[in-house]
Amino acid sequence: MSVEQKYIRNFCIIAHIDHGKSTLADRLLEYTGALSKREMVDQVLDTMDLERERGITIKLQAVRLHYKARDGQEYVLNLIDTPGHVDFTYEVSRSLAACEGALLVVDAAQGIEAQTLANVYLALEHNLEIIPVINKIDLPSAEPERVRREIEDVIGLDASEAILASAKTGVGTEEILEAIIRRVPPPRGDGEAPLQALIFDSIFDSYRGAIPYFRVVQGRVRKGDRIRFMATGAEFEVNEVGVFTPAPRPVESLAAGEVGFLSASIKNVKDTRVGDTITSAERPAPAPLPGYRKVMPMVYCGLFPVESERYDDLRDALEKLQLNDASLTFETETSVALGFGFRCGFLGLLHMEIIQERLEREYGLELITTAPSVVYRVVGTNGSVIMVDNPTALPAPNLIDHIEEPFVEATIMTPKDFVGPVMELCQEKRGSFLNMDYLSEKRVALKYDLPLAEIIYDFFDQLKSRTRGYASLDYSLKGYRPSELVKMDILVNNEVVDALSLITHRDQAYQRGRALVERLRQLIPRQLFDVPIQAAIGSRVIARETIPALRKNVLAKCYGGDVTRKRKLLEKQKEGKKRMKQVGTVDIPQEAFMAVLKAGKS
């Protein structure tokens, strides 16, 4: 039995990290009785341990709540939880496409942050009704009136009806639910039209295969229907249709406006593409739903198993993660130093760290990662254009006319005391200043054009340390621009180690090369012969360190005696070392590859 459309409300919660979004979701679940007190844990919707530990939401969750409103009517509210981090903007846009309204949660002490803004603009693009909620009013440092003014001045929303709440104590929960019913429009859509459903997420279950989460836009879907995925053309028979209350519960059918999941023994993860449209195989919809794009990775790095025989396990693990995470891409890669592995593409650095951690935790893999790199556009002397995401794939310098790198427009919000250090950091990172806005007497928004390569290197860490953790950052891709870029190779014992190569700006090559060789000198164990470590651009060495040889004390047996006797023994040792150097090889320990990532940060 499906619910009448006028009693359905689909909404999501948008907020900056740590403004209390997951806790507010907990209160809504508790208030509507979706979970008993016994089942309640903090941050119910953050199902991964990793999400709880880092205090961030990565995967989307969709929950159906039943709420009896003050008008005596029972409503069905579908809460679609969204991640707030800049790397996951695409996931946010998918959730927003499945809703009609959004709760904008702002911390009463901190005010508006960069990512709040970015997500609000996305919500406005999707024409959502936005309900401002000022959270954490129980804090001694809360200033709800200042935040209310900020919402009006910065975003331009009418905040006179903003709801004051405290997700921790549960104040304002009922007002929020009433506001959703009063202000969010019910879904529109014809239950009898051909089926059109938007996939906004999918998970992989080892028993039931790939399970898409979707919002029905037109028509209805029942158990036993034959469905087709419009992007891939694959067809399946539906075994089960259900909703989350947060635990999965089967239902007869889902009609236009409702949110739920289906299982259809879908073996291949690639069939349930996020953003694809599900339609009926017998009576297909004329066109797929709009607003869907294939998501492009921004950051690439190599992942190699420490034990090369676990290569197949790594591939299986990546395929399973890719199911849950449409934005992860990978292809095989071989490296002279590291053997077989994968070149993986991510949305950003946080996304990269999370995937690595999940591979290590959930699949028990030990990994070596190479330094992250962005996608460069290389224009050849013959006019050809190639995209390079791996420094080893860069053509020879005489074949390159110029190299272009991706630039982003970054918005940095910071307390006004830190404007100086932030501007200094942006200058160091080759940024160009665009403009500066005072949001209130204490807070400033700075806009800069910055190369993406600098942001993925260590920009975020530096920004946090220079502003004592107060600044927040959001960025969007602007396009490509020519830059003075060079490829820097690292040679150990006169042999290039391909996994340590990187593309860097000419002005920073020396500092980066110097930092790297010094770091490697500390990490590579001493051999029985001298080992030179060099950083080189082309054939020109720009920095060098030498690891001195381990030497046996050959003079231990000589007590006194003539100096020529000692000299003879030392010369003989030296000769042996020389021969050894010609045939010796140096094993580079795993820590050395990790060092490349940290070389710029120390």
Swiss-Prot record:
Keyword Zinc-finger annotated: no
GO cellular component, one term: plasma membrane
A GO MF term: translation elongation factor activity
Keywords of this entry: Cell membrane, GTP-binding, Hydrolase, Membrane, Nucleotide-binding, Protein biosynthesis
Record's subcellular location: Cell membrane
Gene3D superfamilies, per database record: 3.30.70.240, Elongation factor 4, C-terminal domain, Elongation Factor G (Translational Gtpase), domain 3, P-loop containing nucleotide triphosphate hydrolases, Translation factors
Top-level EC class: hydrolase
Membrane topology classification: Peripheral membrane protein
Chain ranges of the tr-type G domain: 6-188
GO biological process terms held by the UniProt record: positive regulation of translation
Binding-site list for GTP: 18-23, 135-138
The keyword Phosphoprotein belongs to this UniProt entry's keyword annotation: no
Catalytic reaction equation(s): GTP + H2O = GDP + phosphate + H(+)
Domain of life: Bacteria
InterPro entries: EF-4, EFG_III/V, EFG_V-like, EFTu-like_2, G_TR_CS, LepA_C_sf, LepA_CTD, LepA_IV
Signal peptide: none
Descriptive protein name: Elongation factor 4
Naturally occurring in which organism (per UniProt): Moorella thermoacetica (strain ATCC 39073 / JCM 9320)
